[in-house]
Amino acid sequence: MADQLTEEQIAEFKEAFSLFDKDGDGTITTKELGTVMRSLGQNPTEAELQDMINEVDADGNGTIDFPEFLTMMARKMKDTDSEEEIREAFRVFDKDGNGFISAAELRHVMTNLGEKLTDEEVDEMVREADIDGDGQVNYEEFVEMMTSK
């Protein structure tokens, strides 16, 4: 399953995983799991989280190591996000509800997730998603970004 991930995806997941592996012992607690997945653009429900945890946490000790995490993310990515999950994620980023994600809104959310990005990195993320070149990301552009593999 995890062997279907690209090197870039694995590197992204490793980075996200290590953000939440505070003590660097190679495991994350289950309650951190939801936060990690949301930082990667996934939007699991509580029930889905519980199911995923039960599936992966083989020894039932409440922590997940990186190989288990990779398997789980690969599984989750196979079930492509529903329209509603994408809309929900868009609303998280669109703080003022104007239908656009600005660089400032993106920076705010990413910072809250523990991602310290430079202004250049944030601007680059917006540029990559900004199809019509207006300097912001609208819902259609967001959907395109979330669903393009």
From Swiss-Prot:
Sites bearing N6,N6,N6-trimethyllysine, chain numbering: K116
Binding-site residues for Ca(2+) 3, renumbered to this chain: D94, D96, N98, E105
Gene3D superfamilies in the record: EF-hand
Keywords noted in UniProt: Acetylation, Calcium, Metal-binding, Methylation, Repeat
Positions annotated to bind Ca(2+) 2: D57, D59, N61, T63, E68
Pfam families: EF-hand_7
Disulfide bonds: none
N-acetylalanine found at: A2
Coiled coil segments of this chain: none
Extra information: This protein has four functional calcium-binding sites.
Function comment: Calmodulin mediates the control of a large number of enzymes, ion channels and other proteins by Ca(2+). Among the enzymes to be stimulated by the calmodulin-Ca(2+) complex are a number of protein kinases and phosphatases.
Family affiliation: Belongs to the calmodulin family.
Name recorded for this polypeptide: Calmodulin-2
Organism (species): Branchiostoma lanceolatum
Gene: CAM2
